[in-house]
Amino acid sequence: MKYFLVLVVLTLILAISVGQSDALFVDIIDNVENAIHKAAKTGIGMVKPIENIFIPNQQKKSTEASN
């Protein structure tokens, strides 16, 4: 989330100072932001199955302990 906010602020500052018609870098920053988002989504997708292996066991143990 911090990276996204930094990219948004940087894009706004540069777009205002240069003018949107000359702001080719806005597309570059947008592509970088999309790449970061896809990488994070892929990372979460890879970790989720591993997390699902361990969490049901922990939930079972806590349910058995409370009974």
From Swiss-Prot:
The keyword Signal applies. The keyword Secreted applies. GO terms for biological process: defense response to Gram-positive bacterium; innate immune response; male-specific antibacterial humoral response. Residues 1-19 form the signal peptide. It is found in: Secreted. GO terms for cellular component: extracellular region. Ejaculatory duct of adult males. Keywords: Antibiotic, Antimicrobial, Immunity, Innate immunity, Secreted, Signal. Its main location: secreted. Induction: In response to mating. Belongs to the andropin family. Male-specific peptide with moderate activity against Gram-positive bacteria. This is Andropin. The lineage of its organism: Eukaryota, Metazoa, Ecdysozoa, Arthropoda, Hexapoda. The gene is Anp.
